[in-house]
Swiss-Prot record:
Location of the region described as Complementarity-determining-1 in the Swiss-Prot/TrEMBL record: 24-38
Domain of life: Eukaryota
Gene3D superfamilies assigned: Immunoglobulins
Protein name: Ig kappa chain V-III region 50S10.1
Organism taxonomic ancestry: Eukaryota, Metazoa, Chordata, Craniata, Vertebrata
Position of the signal peptide: none
Species the sequence originates in: Mus musculus
Annotated S-S bridges: 23-92
PANTHER family: IMMUNOGLOBULIN LIGHT CHAIN
Framework-2, as annotated region: 39-53
Region spans: Complementarity-determining-3: 93-101
Length: 111
């Protein structure tokens, strides 16, 4: 299975500032020039919400302050400017190989 190592485990960011979350895969998640890396946001009592798919594409209705980048094994999620509503858990997920696997999560809070 592809192992995803996400960092940091927790992050506190001031309103209006930038939050950056990293995800490293144990092997490349690229295939046919597509990066099979996705990012999800999860709030307590709610299902995960898809923010970013294929490394850099925004999900439906996702605000422009969420962006993704990276290729191969190294990826990042950026949130800028940070808003109060962005307090949540964030997870990377690879969808190159079954079983699809998730990173351990990052808890994002307001500083």
């Amino acid at each position: 299975d592809i192992v995803l190592t996400q960092s940091p485990a927790s992050l506190a960011v001031s309103l209006g500032q930038r939050a950056t979350i990293s995800c490293r895969a144990s092997e490349s998640v690229d295939n046919y020039d597509i990066n099979f890396m996705n990012w999800f946001q999860q709030k307590p009592g709610q299902p995960p919400k898809l923010l970013i798919y294929a490394a850099s594409n925004q999900g439906s209705g996702v605000p422009a302050r969420f962006s993704g980048s990276g290729s191969g094994t190294d990826f990042s999620l950026n949130i800028h400017p940070m808003e109060e509503d962005d307090t949540a858990m964030y997870f990377c997920q690879q969808s190159k190989e079954v079983p699809y696997t998730f990173g351990g999560g990052t808890k994002l809070e307001i500083k």
